[in-house]
Curated annotation (Swiss-Prot):
Disulfide bonds: none annotated. Homodimer. The keyword Hydrolase does not apply. Pathway: Pyrimidine metabolism; dTTP biosynthesis. The active site is at 146 (nucleophile). GO terms for molecular function: thymidylate synthase activity. It is an enzyme of class 2 (transferase). Signal peptide: none annotated. DUMP binds at residues 21, 126-127, 166-169, 177, 207-209. It is found in: Cytoplasm. This is Thymidylate synthase. The gene is thyA. InterPro entries: Thymidate_synth/dCMP_Mease (IPR045097), Thymidate_synth/dCMP_Mease_dom (IPR023451), Thymidate_synth/dCMP_Mease_sf (IPR036926), Thymidylate_synthase (IPR000398), Thymidylate_synthase_AS (IPR020940). CDD domains: TS_Pyrimidine_HMase (cd00351).
Amino acid sequence: MKTYLQLLEHILQQGVEKSDRTGTGTLSVFGYQMRFDLTKGFPLVTTKKLHTRSIVHELLWFLRGDTNISYLKENGVTIWDEWADNNGDLGPVYGKQWRSWPTADGHTIDQLSDVVQQIKSNPDSRRLIVSAWNVGELDKMALMPCHALFQFYVANNKLSCQLYQRSADVFLGVPFNIASYSLLTHMVAQQCNLDVAEFIWTGGDCHLYLNHLEQAQIQLTREPLPLPSLTIKRKPASLFDYAYEDFEFVNYQSHPAIKAPIAV
């Protein structure tokens, strides 16, 4: 995962100081891309320990179309707690847009089901896109989508995915996002009887919060360890029938966790 460390270093060296919505302040660069060959290991950051339970359960929660944190809480995941209201609701965030995008005529579109069917029936399509950036509902969301849009691409019977992340909390959020969308790519590939190829991460405003700079510098002193591999233990009936127990990150080694405050 030297690719990720290079982004940390780039921001520390080239970033400009900017104000932000949270009032914390950031070092920021605009426009950056990282590519991960999914055939050479699963891209879990190894220079600090990641909570893989949170990564998997959050993705399963998205895939359920859920926007209430009760499922996450039941499974020991707290990463959305800061934004939920007293009832645990977040408004029409990722899961709603992925699975039930509202149309003007009162219907809804299940973007994920549609894109899986498109991959199976027309893998050369240039329209294999899922978007969470619903302009008409942004003001109802507890947090507007940071990872806003992703696109699949099939070549030589292999599936790739590219994510556009308009706002990237590089120390806390991006390692989760890389792992989450890489996992999704593996799952979609399995459902479509394809092999995996690449996950490509493209960031817009890529930033380190000013209270994360020391942690980023600590991480840069650490040597990356070999990447784990991913085992999916069964092929369920659909993309929406996976369970936490279906996934195993084999030989995940990491340096110790590095604590950092979340910017709300």
